[in-house]
Design a protein with these regions (language model features):
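Transmembrane alpha-helical insertion/packing segments
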Residues: 1-62
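Short, charged juxtamembrane terminal tails flanking transmembrane helices
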Residues: 1-5, 169-177
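Alpha-helical transmembrane segments of multipass membrane proteins
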Residues: 18, 22-30, 50, 85-93, ...
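Membrane-helix interface/capping segments
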Residues: 58-74, 98
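Juxtamembrane "helix-exit" motif at the C-terminal end of transmembrane alpha-helices
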Residues: 75-103
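Functional transmembrane-helix hotspots
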Residues: 92-120
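Short membrane-interface loop/juxtamembrane segments of multi-pass integral membrane proteins
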Residues: 116-142
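Individual transmembrane alpha-helix segments
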Residues: 133-159
Length: 177
């Protein structure tokens, strides 16, 4: 009788938890990097490393399937990892922003206004005027809107990235003597 192997969806649900925690670390670093500048470097490392983490899981699945996993299956695994990981990270990030830094969007906007106002060519630009008006009239996104937009951005980017990492994960398995 054939051994029942877990599907890519089952694997993604298990592997999506550590990946979601990984994405959460990147999100926390992005929210607090203006308070602690070395977090900007950590954030960049985590963002650039996320395709490597997905590649690791895709490659692991490919090897477990003895090299018979198709590109579409590996791509779907990557998509599901990003989807499930981003759901977990989004929930945690909402709590972090809502209760840890509820004025995050306004802090960032005020920082941008200050930086652009210090540049003589940009001081009276339309961008600065519009951003000042948005801050004054409280039109910047709420924490849930910020997290929701980040969810779609990471998920879409992850879908594209997963296609590339799936190609790389399908390289030949080395034969053992």
């Amino acid at each position: 009788m054939r051994e029942q192997r877990p599907s890519i969806y089952q694997k993604a649900s298990v592997w999506g938890i550590p990946f979601g925690l990984y994405l959460t670390c990147a999100g926390v670093a992005s929210v607090f990097m203006d308070w602690f500048p070395p977090l900007a470097f950590i954030f960049m490392l985590l963002v650039l490393g996320s395709p490597l983490v997905v590649y690791y899981f895709q490659r692991k699945h490919f090897i477990e399937e003895n090299g018979f996993a198709e590109h579409a299956a590996l791509w779907m695994l990557g998509i599901m990892l990003y989807m499930l990981g981003t759901v977990l990270a989004s929930f945690i990030m909402f709590l972090v922003i809502q209760y840890g830094r509820p004025e995050f969007a306004y802090d960032q906007a005020n920082h941008i206004i200050k930086v652009y106002s210090d540049i003589p060519e940009m001081r009276d630009s339309e961008f600065v005027t519009v951003l000042k008006r948005a801050v004054e009239t409280h039109q910047l996104p709420s924490p849930i809107e910020t997290v929701f937009n980040a969810f779609w951005f990471v998920t879409f980017g992850g879908c594209i990235t997963s296609a590339i990492t799936a190609i790389l994960a399908r390289r030949n398995i080395k034969k053992r003597p």
